[in-house]
Amino acid sequence: MLGLKEKICLYGFNNLTKTLSFNIYDICYAKTEREKEDYIKYIDEQYNSERLTKILCDVTEMIGAHVLNISKQDYEPQGASVNVLITEEALPVALIDPSCNKGELSYLELRDSVVGHLDKSHLTVHTYPEFHPNNDIISFRVDIDVSTCGKISPLNALDYLIGSFDSDVITIDYRVRGFTRDVDGRKCYIDHDIKSIQDYIDGETLKKYDAMDVNVYQSNIFHTKMMLKDIVLNNYLFNSDPYELSPNDRREIRDRISKEMIEIYGGVNIY
């Protein structure tokens, strides 16, 4: 196990940066152009910037941080982005930069433009709907980054993030960068035990997925990818009833969905 057997008394502020990169893929079967367009519109409404903002604010609360500023934007024809600047400790109002809105979205609505902040502690989310006219399989990707410094850890929000989306395929990257020092001046490159990202995911959630790790312990790099085990066809058809299809059609669609998930899971074109 990589990490610390006992707690270390640090000197000054904890300078370690912990970054969690979380990507989920939602797969759907849509045969006609109308079905594809309707699915993209549905996804765009389902995961607009307002809902994504709420998810990131919930994550902020779960990891024990505080919101300093929120920037959000819905895009045309589709897609959305949200950026949340956070701090480990609550700051007195007098110390908060006047440009920060403290998460008060009514203030955002009064501004013609919103400029995102860059800081060591922040959350970002972007959505990427994807389809091709020659393919009946549509995918939707959500890309979330949580970067923290200090004692707070983004790993504590993993279960909530997985449950917040229709997660068919998931890729998770976690890394720790920088160093901090103990009271004797000795450098510390990681401040918690970790052998796998899977240790931070609920066992009941893991039962639903095939999962594998690719970790580089010496570099404090951890990677886990997950693929849903059971394909329930009704969850993948948009505005269609699977029982209106012939058994052969159902098998073919299930097979195509499975192949799409396997390729995304492996990160390589196979079929």
UniProtKB/Swiss-Prot annotation:
The modification Pyruvic acid (Ser) is found at residue 121. It comes from the Bacteria. Gene3D superfamilies: S-adenosylmethionine decarboxylase (3.60.90.10). It catalyses: S-adenosyl-L-methionine + H(+) = S-adenosyl 3-(methylsulfanyl)propylamine + CO2. The active site is at residues 121, 126, 149. Binds 1 pyruvoyl group covalently per subunit. Keywords: Autocatalytic cleavage, Decarboxylase, Lyase, Polyamine biosynthesis, Pyruvate, S-adenosyl-L-methionine, Schiff base, Spermidine biosynthesis, Zymogen. Pfam families: AdoMet_dc (PF02675). It is an enzyme of class 4 (lyase). Pathway: Amine and polyamine biosynthesis; S-adenosylmethioninamine biosynthesis; S-adenosylmethioninamine from S-adenosyl-L-methionine: step 1/1. InterPro entries: AdoMetDC_fam_prok, S-AdoMet_deCO2ase_bac, S-AdoMet_deCO2ase_core. GO terms for molecular function: adenosylmethionine decarboxylase activity. GO terms for cellular component: cytosol. Is synthesized initially as an inactive proenzyme. Formation of the active enzyme involves a self-maturation process in which the active site pyruvoyl group is generated from an internal serine residue via an autocatalytic post-translational modification. Two non-identical subunits are generated from the proenzyme in this reaction, and the pyruvate is formed at the N-terminus of the alpha chain, which is derived from the carboxyl end of the proenzyme. The record marks 120-121 as: Cleavage (non-hydrolytic). Its EC number is 4.1.1.50. Its cofactor is pyruvate. GO terms for biological process: spermidine biosynthetic process. Heterooctamer of four alpha and four beta chains arranged as a tetramer of alpha/beta heterodimers. Belongs to the prokaryotic AdoMetDC family. Type 2 subfamily. Catalyzes the decarboxylation of S-adenosylmethionine to S-adenosylmethioninamine (dcAdoMet), the propylamine donor required for the synthesis of the polyamines spermine and spermidine from the diamine putrescine. This is S-adenosylmethionine decarboxylase proenzyme. It comes from Clostridium perfringens (strain 13 / Type A).
